[in-house]
């Protein structure tokens, strides 16, 4: 038996995926049965959707006109979503205590194929089990990487694999600081092959003027624990790289309840040597109140993209330039909203300079401004019935997939003209 896994049936890795049932003739994704379409004249639904199990209503959701939303499937506590090169949606479903508080985790990485291409997941199957603390997922040309608590491990991967191929290998054991709450280790690969991993700090850290590494970004360099390259993070909850630019970014969930002292959540570039301030500084020249007289924040890197404390940016990905203007190439960010009422839970887009790959200055401080737009809203209608937006990924075909960690629903969104 594989370490930490389940044995596949004989020759399972050599079997092709199950044959598709009936492939719907729709030429565009938004014409598939079950699609909720946002027309200029109102909201309509394409008849003939899934009936074996009744999908949840998506009537609460508000999107721009000429877009559609479609239910895909359900996984308890989906904390990260990634597409395999062969099209299966992989989902990290942990049970370890997390800031999201999602229920029904499977302590596994599961996958959801759509072999008949009807827009719904065909099934939910376990790829790797016995993973109570897992979040980071990454496919490279040769391997599948994933988080197992403090460890980043990998298994050989070939297109179409639905079981681990061979023994797992520990790539790094990141123990510079081990947070019981901020244990997730998101990761991604830059265009040049560099892999970056987030490592969480803690809410109650005292300001140490020597600035040791605790929460920050680690580069996998072949050493046992990886190389710390950027510090001053409380909780780098998400890491993503933008294709074609060799640039990577991270979301920082900053000090709770610090809005009145200048605190803000951030979406920042990953660069070697950067110090983003925590736990001493909220941003450049803005020390946290308890160290106002002692902390020097003049060298803290200023952010270009900021969010109100409590908006709680949770996951993001970059649109692969298949959507129309003004969304082409944007970063799409899932906002988890405030604890309790989930106020502010929504999906926003952040404009990107398509020539350089840089994020345009954007903020939700004092209202949505700069290069940021509200894209999907409706989760925070006080009912607590629709989940909280958590993980985001784009499929190669251009659809945006969004997972809600509190109810497990996974949906996809597409513009009307996106072809299958």
Where are these regions (language model features)?
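Beta-propeller domain segments
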Residues: 19-64, 184, 201-205, 212-215, ...
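Beta-propeller domains
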Residues: 60, 85, 89-120, 158-160
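Residue-level marker for isolated small/hydroxyl-bearing positions within beta-strands
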Residues: 84, 92-94, 140, 147-149, ...
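Surface loop/turn motifs at the tips and blade-to-blade linkers of beta-strand repeat domains
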Residues: 71-76, 125-132, 171-179, 227-232, ...
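Ser/Thr-rich, Pro/Gly/Ala-heavy low-complexity intrinsically disordered linkers and tails
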Residues: 1-22
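Asp-box/WD-like beta-propeller blade repeats and closely related beta-sheet repeat scaffolds
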Residues: 123-129, 133-140, 149-190, 202, ...
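Blade-loop segments of beta-propeller domains
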Residues: 77-79, 104-142, 375
């Amino acid at each position: 038996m594989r370490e930490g896994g389940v044995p596949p049936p004989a020759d399972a890795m050599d079997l092709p995926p199950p044959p598709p049932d009936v492939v719907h003739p729709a030429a565009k994704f938004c014409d598939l049965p079950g699609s909720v379409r946002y027309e200029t004249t109102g909201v309509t639904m394409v008849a003939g959707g899934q009936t074996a199990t009744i999908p949840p209503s998506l009537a609460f959701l508000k999107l721009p006109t000429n877009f559609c939303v479609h239910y895909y499937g359900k996984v308890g506590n989906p904390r990260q979503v990634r597409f395999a090169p062969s099209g299966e949606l992989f989902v990290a479903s942990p049970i370890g205590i997390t800031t999201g508080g999602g229920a029904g985790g499977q302590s596994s990485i599961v996958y959801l194929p759509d072999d008949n291409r009807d827009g719904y997941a065909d099934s939910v199957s376990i790829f790797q089990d016995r993973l109570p603390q897992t979040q980071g997922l990454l496919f490279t040309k040769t391997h599948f990487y994933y988080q197992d608590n403090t460890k980043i491990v990998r298994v050989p991967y070939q297109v179409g694999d639905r079981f681990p191929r061979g023994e797992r290998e520990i790539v790094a054991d990141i123990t510079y600081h081990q947070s019981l709450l901020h244990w997730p280790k998101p990761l991604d690969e830059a265009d040049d092959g560099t892999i970056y991993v987030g490592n969480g700090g803690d809410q109650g850290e005292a300001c140490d003027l020597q600035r040791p590494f605790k929460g920050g970004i680690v580069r996998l360099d072949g050493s046992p624990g990886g190389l710390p390259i950027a510090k001053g993070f409380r909780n780098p909850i998400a890491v993503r790289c933008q294709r074609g630019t060799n640039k990577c970014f991270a979301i920082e969930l900053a000090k709770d309840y610090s809005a009145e002292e200048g605190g803000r959540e951030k979406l920042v570039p990953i660069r070697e040597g950067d110090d983003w301030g925590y736990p001493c500084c909220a941003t450049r020249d803005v020390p946290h109140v308890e160290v106002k007289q002692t902390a020097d924040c003049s060298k803290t890197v200023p952010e270009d993209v900021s969010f109100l404390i409590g908006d709680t940016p949770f996951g993001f990905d970059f649109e692969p330039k298949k959507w129309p203007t003004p969304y082409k190439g944007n970063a799409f960010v899932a906002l988890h909203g405030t604890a309790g009422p989930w106020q502010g839970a929504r999906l926003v887009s952040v404009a990107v300079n398509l020539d350089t790959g840089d994020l345009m200055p954007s903020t939700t401080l004092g209202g949505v401004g700069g290069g940021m737009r509200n894209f999907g809203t409706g989760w925070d209608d006080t009912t607590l019935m629709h989940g909280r937006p958590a993980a985001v990924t784009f499929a190669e075909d251009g659809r945006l997939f969004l997972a809600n960690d509190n109810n497990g629903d996974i949906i996809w969104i597409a513009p009307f003209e996106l072809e299958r």
